[in-house]
Amino acid sequence: MDTTPTTLSRNTSSAVEEQHSVARTLVLHLLPGVLVLVFFLAVAPLVWGIGFPPVMAVYLASVFVVVPFELGYLIYQARKNGTSLGNIVLYRQPVPKGQLVLLVVLLFVGGSVLGALLLPVDFIVKENLFSWVPSGYDVTYGLYGDVARFSTTALLVMWVFGLPVNVIAGPVVEEMYFRGYLLPRISRFGVWAPLLNTVLFSLYHFFNPFGFISRIGSFLPMAYGAWWKRSIYVSMIVHVLFNFTTAVFILLLILGIFGGVPG
């Protein structure tokens, strides 16, 4: 796959080192998602068999697929080019603390609202296009409903395991890979680059196709924030907050705060 090299100084606000071809862009955005899907399809029945919801397979995929592949690819690129990881992962411009806090709050709230407004579309898509997906492969099963199918102990073990994996490690590595590596290398698309990056990022979640639309709504403001400020620290914090908020909500469901106490 061809790339077009240009010049890059050590300052990440400078010109991008290379521009990926469309083919390479598609492959690098979607390949990790394909690998996660294969892992998920293989492991979901196993975790189901020992009493865990399907999402436990996603958390395991973060450990055995997402982090090793995405971080490993970045390290490989650094070694291949005889440079440091810092020259591979771009968009690392510092943002003044006050601006950072304000921007994070705005992007978090904005993304949360947009995602929530688009949730009904997800439900329509799920009912009309993916109603055939078995419960054992539905990542929402046992979280937002049917919690009685799983023991409280199993759900809490899953939640504790997912906290460092899905709230910290996964988002940090994904932001390094998607917004720090891939986004700068499609900068030739200008203002459309974050949109393309976000659509492909949402599609990369092949294991959860129902959430495609709302995921775009949630992550698009964040991607534009990182692109505008040339700082993955912005998107990294917002991404962590998204996943942390989801984790808190899931914990409340497990504990029966919103109804249905699990068995």
Ranges and model annotations:
Residues 25, 55, 69, 140, ...:
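A general marker of short, structured functional hotspots
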Residues 83, 115, 119, 123, ...:
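Short helix-terminus and kink motifs of transmembrane alpha helices
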Residues 31-33, 75, 133-137, 186, ...:
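A short, ordered amphipathic alpha-helix with a cationic face
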Residues 112, 143-263:
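Transmembrane helix-loop-helix hairpins at the membrane interface
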Residues 1-113, 123-124, 129, 244-263:
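N-terminal, membrane-interfacial amphipathic/helix-forming hydrophobic leader that caps
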Residues 124-155:
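Membrane-interface interhelical connector segments
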